[in-house]
């Protein structure tokens, strides 16, 4: 299993989750967990995904997700799980 953490932050609008999940499913990336909240009109989502069977390499997927975020009007970041864990350790 190759896990990654995807974060999405920005103004809430219709279809954010749908657009991100559609991209992931089209490229055979499995969503393992998802947490989403909206606070005062700001959308925040964190996903744990498995990209072991993805049809794109990790770097291409990261770039595509950033471009998708630009299209939607949110910021999308994707990091390998081990990098995310090391960066957020206290």
Curated annotation (Swiss-Prot):
Taxonomic lineage of the native organism:
Bacteria, Bacillati, Actinomycetota, Actinomycetes, Bifidobacteriales
Q: Identify the Gene3D superfamilies for this entry.
A: 3.30.70.260
InterPro entries membership: ACT-like_dom_sf, ACT_dom, UPF0237/GcvR_regulator, UPF0237_ACT
The protein's organism comes out as: Bifidobacterium longum (strain NCC 2705)
From what superkingdom does this record's organism come? Bacteria
Name of a matching Pfam family: ACT_6
PROSITE patterns noted in UniProt:
ACT
Protein's name according to its UniProt entry: UPF0237 protein BL1209.1
Q: Which family does it belong to?
A: Belongs to the UPF0237 family.
Q: CDD domains this protein is in?
A: ACT_1ZPV
């Amino acid at each position: 299993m190759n896990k990654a953490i995807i974060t999405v932050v920005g103004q809430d609008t219709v279809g954010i989750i749908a657009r991100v999940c559609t991209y992931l499913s089209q490229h055979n990336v499995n969503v393992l967990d998802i947490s989403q909240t909206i606070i005062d009109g700001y959308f925040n989502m964190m996903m744990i995904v498995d990209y072991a069977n993805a049809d794109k390499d990790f770097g291409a997927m990261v770039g595509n997700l950033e471009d998708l975020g630009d299209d939607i009007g949110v910021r999308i970041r994707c990091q390998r799980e081990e990098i995310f864990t090391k960066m957020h350790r206290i």
